From Swiss-Prot:
Organism classification: Bacteria, Bacillati, Cyanobacteriota, Cyanophyceae, Oscillatoriophycideae
Subunit-structure text: Binds ribosomal protein uS19.
Protein name (record): Ribosome maturation factor RimM
Superkingdom as given in the UniProt entry: Bacteria
PANTHER family from the UniProt entry: RIBOSOME MATURATION FACTOR RIMM (PTHR33692:SF1)
Subcellular locations according to the entry: Cytoplasm
Gene3D superfamilies documented for this protein: PRC-barrel domain, RimM
Domain PRC barrel residue range list: 99-186
Pfam families named in the record: PRC_RimM (PF24986), RimM (PF01782)
Protein task: An accessory protein needed during the final step in the assembly of 30S ribosomal subunit, possibly for assembly of the head region. Essential for efficient processing of 16S rRNA. May be needed both before and after RbfA during the maturation of 16S rRNA. It has affinity for free ribosomal 30S subunits but not for 70S ribosomes.
One Gene Ontology MF term: ribosome binding
GO cellular component: cytoplasm; ribosome
Disulfide bonds, paired cysteine numbers: none
Statement: the UniProt record of this protein carries the keyword DNA damage: no
Amino acid sequence: MEENWLEIGTIVAPQGLEGELRVLSVSDFPERFQKRGMRGIQGPQGGEIREITLLRGRELPGKNVYVIKLEGVENREQAEALRGYKLWANKLEKPRLKADEYHVSELVNLEVYHHLTGEKIGVVVDIFWAGNDILAVQLEANLASVKKKSPSSDSEARALVPFVKEIVPLVDLKAARIEIAPPPGLLEINLS
C-alpha cells in the first residue's frame, strides 16, 4: 500500500495538552502539514498505513518542524502514543512544481551518467536533505578505482552527490537519466 503514499514526516513529540503533535518534516511543501485533508499514518515498526484526517497545522519557524492536529487525537496521552509514527501524503495529491524542481520519487532509480564522457556512474538510490539535496548514487561495478577507497563492500559503494545545477546539469525524467559533472575527487571523497 506504500506505493500510494509519500512519506512527509515523523511525529517526534506531543505539543501542549490538547493532542497536538510536533512533526519533523521531510517534505519541501508546507501545505502538506497546513491544509486540511486526508493523510496516512504508520507505526514506528512499519506495517499498514491507515488514513487519518489532518485538521490543521502550523510551522515552527526555523526548525523544519510543524505542529499539527489530527482527528481523534484529543489529549497529550493520545499524542504521546503516536511518537515515532510516520506521516504520509497521498501521491496523487502532489503539489505543482516549478521548472527544475522534482519530487524525490521521480529521482530515485534514475541512472546517473558522467556529463562529459557519457560513462554510466550508477543509479540514484536515495536522497538526503542537508543545506541542499544530496543524491545517494549506487556506483557501477566498473568504477573500481573509486570503490577501492570505499569503506563499504564493492557491491554497496555509494557516492554522495550534491543536487545543484553546477554538478547536476541535466535531469531527463522521460529518459530516466541524470547527468553529473563532478569536480575532480567528488566521487572519491563523498563515498558512504
